[in-house]
């Protein structure tokens, strides 16, 4: 039987809508906690040797979600001491959500719709889920995903906070959790 990692060894998984800063926060948090950082979307791009948008276009969303699910579950169940950034839609998959909750510490980076919308111009080209969508449709997707992100995760409001501030806060909270809940 496989040993369940201690609270200190568990991977830390960052979830939230696309473009909220999971990769930026994750990279810095991993450095602060002396862990490896994994961006699942980047790992998928390396594996398939193409951009996510090209995978969606050439292989379809279903093929993308399948490899996303396989990789994420593998990272969650077979590794430890990592900070893992999930793509915005990954946590919507039941199998991924279960693996994250069973084996990792899940942190939801929350950004308000109004501030997210301000980032739209820099996001739209690299986010296939947003292609050909009206702003109203994007808002519906944003709103639809919120309850799933919020359920069973530690929520961090990111509005008006710089990455360094978010990382410092998370480092403090995580280390406090380690102290309270033991090794």
From Swiss-Prot:
Query: Its function?
Result: Catalyzes the specific phosphorylation of the 3-hydroxyl group of shikimic acid using ATP as a cosubstrate.
Q: Binding of Mg(2+): at which residues?
A: 23
Q: Which Pfam families match?
A: SKI (PF01202)
Please name the GO terms of the biological process aspect recorded for this protein, alphabetically.
Answer: amino acid biosynthetic process; aromatic amino acid family biosynthetic process; chorismate biosynthetic process
The primary gene name is aroK
What does the subunit comment say?
A: Monomer.
As to how many cofactors bind and how, the note says: Binds 1 Mg(2+) ion per subunit.
**Protein name, as recorded:** Shikimate kinase
Give the pathway listed in the UniProt entry for this protein. Answer: Metabolic intermediate biosynthesis; chorismate biosynthesis; chorismate from D-erythrose 4-phosphate and phosphoenolpyruvate: step 5/7
Enzyme superclass (EC): transferase
InterPro entries of this UniProt entry? P-loop_NTPase, Shikimate/glucono_kinase, Shikimate_kinase/TSH1
Q: Which cofactor does it need?
A: Mg(2+)
Q: Highest lineage ranks of the organism?
A: Bacteria, Bacillati, Bacillota, Bacilli, Bacillales
Q: Where does substrate bind?
A: 41, 65, 88, 145
Q: Which residues are listed for ATP binding in this entry?
A: 19-24, 127, 161
Print the keywords alphabetically. Amino-acid biosynthesis, Aromatic amino acid biosynthesis, ATP-binding, Cytoplasm, Kinase, Magnesium, Metal-binding, Nucleotide-binding, Transferase
